[in-house]
Structures are given as C-alpha cells and as structure tokens.
Amino acid sequence: MAYQEPNKDGFYGKFGGRFVPETLMTAVLELEKAYRESQADPSFQEELNQLLRQYVGRETPLYYAKNLTQHIGGAKIYLKREDLNHTGAHKINNALGQVWLAKRMGKKKIIAETGAGQHGVATATAAALFNMECTIHMGEEDVKRQALNVFRMELLGAKVEAVTDGSRVLKDAVNAALRSWVANIDDTHYILGSALGPHPFPEIVRDFQSVIGREAKQQYRDLTGQNLPDALVACVGGGSNAIGLFHPFVEDESVAMYGAEAAGLGVDTEHHAATLTKGRPGVLHGSLMDVLQDAHGQILEAFSISAGLDYPGIGPEHSHYHDIKRASYVPVTDEEALEGFQLLSRVEGIIPALESSHAIAFAVKLAKELGPEKSMIVCLSGRGDKDVVQVKDRLEADAAKKGEAHA
C-alpha cells in the first residue's frame, strides 16, 4: 500500500487536522512553513544527525534479548534500546529536533509540557545545549510522582511550573502550555512531547522519532540476515515512540504492529488510559483523535501507574492505523506492567521504564503465541531509574496487603 499521510490539512484519514483558535493559527502555520523549509535544507538534517550521533549517542543498539526469549520459549525478542539515549529515553530525539528548529526560526524561549518528566528533561537538556530559556509545565500530581526529574529539569536551568488545574496531570499540563504559548507567541516555541496536537505537530514528532524505526529496520537485517521481523511492539500513551518505530514499516504489510495501552486497574473499571480500546473520536488539544469521554463528550480522567501513559487521547496517526486495521492496540494492566518491569530486570539486567514495561508485558504474551520460528522488535522506550522508588513502594504495599490477607 502507498502510505501518504497526512494530507495538506493535516488529516490522517479521518483523524488529525488543526482545531485551534485564531490566536494560535498564525503560530502553527508559521511552524509548518519553517518545518517545510528545514526539510528542504540538507544542512538542517546534517546538523541534526551530527547532534544525534555525538550528543545523544545514536544509533542505539538493537539487542537480541536471548535470556528473555529462552525464558519465554517463544518468538525471538529484539529490544530497540532507546533507554540508552542521553537523558534515558526516546524523548530527546524529538526535543533536540524541535529546539534546533526553534533556533532556526529565531525564537528565544522554549515551553513544553511533561508527564513522567522525560520529555521535560529532554527539552530542558536541548534548551541548555542551545542556550535558550525554558519553562516546563507539569501537573502537580506528576511533580510529586517524579520529584527526581523535577530536580533534573531545574538543574538544567529550566523553570518548572506545577499545574494545579483539573486532575493535575498530563492533559492539564498541555492545556497550561498551550495557554502560555498563546500569550507569548512572538518569541516562544512550544515543543509538544508526543505525536499529538494540531497539525503539523503529529507529523513533526513522527518524523523526528522515525529514526527509531529506520535504524531498527537496517539493524534487524544486519543482525539476522532476514529482511523483516514478524511483529513490532511499543507502548502507547500519546504514541511518539510507537509511531517512531511503526512508521518506517507501515508499507511492509507482513509486519504486524502492536501498541500496548495502559489498562490501569482494568478496562472495565474507570481507572485506565486505554484510549483505542474504550475511547471514541473527539477533539482534544487541537486534533481529532480517539478520546476517553463520557456520553456527553466530556473528557474522562485517564489513569495509569505510569505517569507517561495517563493521557486520555492518542496521536491521530495511531487512530488512523487502528481505523484502517494496520495496527492493533492492546490493553496492559498496571499489574502486568509491574511483572514486565521485574522480569526484564531479573533475566536481562535491564531496568525498563514503567511505560516500556507495558510493551514488555505484551511482548511476553505475543512471543508465546507466535512461537520460536517468529521474531519481533520491541521498543524499549526508556530506562526505569525514575520509577524504581515508585515500584519499590508499590511492591511493598502489595506484599503488606497479602500479609494481612493471610493473617
């Protein structure tokens, strides 16, 4: 199939577009123009590639997880090690690209939102590198959950604004960042952290993250002598690491693509963030996408053990893949993610982020189904240092509950 998305209005099939007030339309049109110019300028990509190599540490390895594969006794599992990037996750691929773009546009200040803190840290890092002023909007709940990342951002010279509106999580941070952008449009660039928001943001983020899939595709051939894996697996919140892995394979129809959504306490409870499992189309943050909403169209609260996945929408390109059945999106509960977190740590000596642990948990199930003749690439989107204290507290609390039950 020839895949040519988005169209000129930023639609991926029936999803996407730019649903923004007039005050923001000028800024998104200016951004699109600057991005098109940078795409046509070989020096932009050359400079970015050099930074990705020398500063970020790309390319990241494609690692055959032999112990995990043998432990499961199913399909071969290859991990795309985005956890080994500078700052510890895939977020730097996009942050660096967008700060470099903003610098070329003559902007002086950078604003961003963050959930788990990884995009905030990546943006603060890139802003420090390019000597730009940086403000990060972060939900008050996430500020508490991710105190270490808050300190890292401040250490890097960024100002962290705790958002006290709404449920004080990622979607509220996006709202606050958009408001700030409207008020400071002339000298400020807003760096969206996921493949969300009004066009051209989903396309820009996808393009900067597609380095993941491009590298993985070539590395798989070099490692195995085979053309393509049978499946790809990535966790999905807004969906930037997943779209970065999936997009370079989208026309390879023999490759199945799976996004692992946060099912929280279960998709039949009110505590989850499984947007494609339980949501329906709606407009959120300037884009038409699948959204968790009630019967009256009010946005529901998303819930996940992982701060980076509790977003009530999903990038429009993922909604499109789901709609045309090019990718499958599967729910993974908090409990399953915790098992994945511990399993990978124990058998491979790699502590994954809680976000990535959702992908690991589903990969374990899929490997058993596919059997030993097949193979898959799993995006290990980030490292778990930021989550170790939270997991420790959770496991200790669970153990105490079990103890009480047996008493």
Curated annotation (Swiss-Prot):
Pathway annotation: Amino-acid biosynthesis; L-tryptophan biosynthesis; L-tryptophan from chorismate: step 5/5
One Gene Ontology CC term in the entry: cytoplasm
Keywords: Amino-acid biosynthesis, Aromatic amino acid biosynthesis, Lyase, Pyridoxal phosphate, Tryptophan biosynthesis
GO MF annotations, alphabetized: tryptophan synthase activity
Catalytic activity annotation: (1S,2R)-1-C-(indol-3-yl)glycerol 3-phosphate + L-serine = D-glyceraldehyde 3-phosphate + L-tryptophan + H2O
EC number(s) from the headed UniProt entry: 4.2.1.20
Modified residues (N6-(pyridoxal phosphate)lysine): K91
Coiled coil: none
Cofactor: pyridoxal 5'-phosphate
Job of this protein: The beta subunit is responsible for the synthesis of L-tryptophan from indole and L-serine.
Similarity comment: family membership: Belongs to the TrpB family.
SUBUNIT field: Tetramer of two alpha and two beta chains.
Protein name in the entry: Tryptophan synthase beta chain
